[in-house]
Amino acid sequence: MHRKKGLYTRVYFIVHGAMLRKTFGTGKYLAIKNKIRYDYSVGLQNVPRCKGEIMDTVFFDMDGTLIDTEKYYNVCWCEAIAKFGYTITKEEALDLRSLGRPHVYRFFEEKYGKGFPYDEMRAYRKKIMEEMLKRDGITVKPGAKEILLWLKSRQIRCMIATATDLERTNRYLEMAGLSSYFDEIISAVMVKNGKPSPDIYQLACEKAGRMPSDCIAIEDSPNGVRAAAAAGCRVFMIPDLDEPDEATRALCEGVFPSLSELRRHFVKIL
């Protein structure tokens, strides 16, 4: 493990050595490089970074972060569960935001028992939600297009990391007029475990060819924040429907009221 960690770090120096030498000076650069050469246990967390040197990838959650669809999920979960003779409060349904399999199965089994007809209920929930979105359309969250345009102007790659399946993700982004901003979509259907497990963000980092610590994740829900943080990404949160608790806040580099405010912060740090 140490040898592998040291290899990653040495590759980092090969790629970014010129920038590090220019920023920190030849003496400090060589001292760090020589230490890594003889000590495989040194990881990238111990290597000084140049601000923004490879911070060129941002992962966006979709529902509740870029588009205003979480409110529909919340209503439809409650309605679909009631349709099958069970009850859930809107507050309890918030725990389902971005929750991927097998976590969602566990949620319903623990709450209602093994006989709960999850697959039938979920199919009904999807049906009524599609009817609502067809009726109302999809609203883009305030500041979404502005932050995407700004990131693109800086040649910063934008990718989707969502719990929604690929077909609906592509359709929703098209309906919202956001498809052209994204280089790639990572969906929960592409990994074994969805959020709050880190799998989605681990795959996103792999696709981007970047280490997690060099990637930013933007999320709206606690499950999404936990997934991104567990993968090792820099996490920023734009809360939707409710405010995060202290445990969730502690996982974030910043919590902002809107994507507009986050963009203003990015102007300072990227």
Where are these regions (language model features)?
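Short, Lys/Arg-enriched N-terminal segments with co-localized hydrophobic residues
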Residues: 32-54
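Asp-based, Mg2+/Mn2+-dependent phosphohydrolase catalytic module
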Residues: 43, 54-56, 149-152, 165-270
